[in-house]
Amino acid sequence: MAAQRMRDGRPVIWSPQPAQARFMQRTENEVLYGGAAGGGKSDALVIEALRQVEIPHYRGLIIRKTFPQLRELIDKTMRYYKPVFPKARYNGSTHCWTFPSGAKIYFGSMNHAQDRYNYQGQAYDFIGFDELTHFTWEEYSYLLSRNRPNGPDTRVYTRATANPGGIGHGWVKARFVSPAPPGTRMVQMVKARAPDGREIVQRRTRIFIPSTVFDNAALLENDPGYLGTLAALPEAEKKALLYGDWDSFTGQVFTEWKNDPAHYDDQRWTHVIRPFRIPGHWKIWRGYDFGYSKPFSVGWYAADEEGRLYRIRELYGCTGTPNEGIKADPVKQARMIREAEENDPMLRGRTILGVADPAIFNESQGESIAAMQEKSPNFLHWAPGDHTRLAGKMQFHYRLAFQADGRPMLQVFNTCKHFIRTIPNLVYSESNVEDIDTDQEDHIYDECRYVLMENPLSPPRTEPVQPMPDDPLELGKKARFFRV
């Protein structure tokens, strides 16, 4: 906050900086503000919550993942709310501000997924999420259902702030950042069926408003050294927190990951490549992770003469909502897999080696999933995969490491959109710091891990050599691999 100023003979408690003003002027249903540290996100959020406090039945909610994280936000409201509304009262037991009109702003948390049911039956005209990437999609979407009016003439909307990273990084990026350039309104038409059979169509809007420390002149004036603090961070954190880079963030498991369209053809210094014809003598693997309410995942991999694996096709049982399965039973999944292999020229007529989550062989509650899928007419055969988690994670690291020639030992066709979406977004578990967080959308990771464990690599002997930046003959661009 800038030093106190006067306007019309009255003190100015707070005034928005340009990026904050852009955020607060938006009219969409959902707005995400941020992308980097120090942009003044939290200040804008707690001030935005005041917009309707003159309406007696207005109810607002500001939420963080855990309650201790709310302390700073509550301190901000003490600094801002009381001078503007001297008769407003904060109740430390209920964590609620009550304003002279009767309007209320609550502070809440959702430390565990089941905590979302603490808000069951509640209605909030405004919901503000601070650090949205700390929440799962299930938590966010449930609270969206609580975003409804408490009476006439209130505006009903949600606002959120975030930095890259955290368990929710993937879905937040997919919902707000990836679909459109920053500052571009996204429109979604949603449908519902009325009891009389009528189809009701409504319009939902959302937008991402970026912000970095460079947008916070007040902070840089009060603490010029903060810019240096961010610039001195390790590279991944620096990219995320200084520049708001959503492709690099703290806690990312596979920091080796690189998706460079400029090298899709020469296959160097990128894990994503353009599809090519698979030679007939290459071995084909099929990995499988079963899911019902969560997505199931099938990946097909080709192995070349050097032991390099290529993910050439995928089948992902997702509704389009992050981490939500299509609820297909085991036999239907087997039929979908068989149809893919019969219709895809890369797979038709091939001998395919299937490896799957050992859990599908469980017979404790009747016929196993593996047995159901092996029956006529699908005849899918699976071998139980090696479920050793840390060894499997290390195989991922070994495979993703670039060799001296710029080629890794695992590459992915650019048609495998869900692999490309989910693998870079995996973060470490807070309780088991060597493993990934299993509450994420990790189904593709699991089925790939089973295939990697069937084709283990030794640790790379040497660090990869990065290409020389000075390449006047453009030899790197001209190099290309041809398949015969």
Feature map (PLM): residue ranges:
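ASCE P-loop NTPase helicase motor core
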Residues: 134-216
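Pre-P-loop entry segment of helicase/translocase ATPase cores
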Residues: 1-29
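ATPase catalytic-site recognition across NTP-hydrolyzing enzymes
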Residues: 215-288
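Conserved RecA-like ASCE P-loop NTPase motor core of nucleic-acid helicases/translocases
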Residues: 58-70
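Walker A/P-loop NTP-binding motif
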Residues: 42-56
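Mg2+-dependent endonuclease catalytic cores in nucleic-acid-processing enzymes, primarily RNase H-like
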Residues: 307-437, 456-468, 473-484
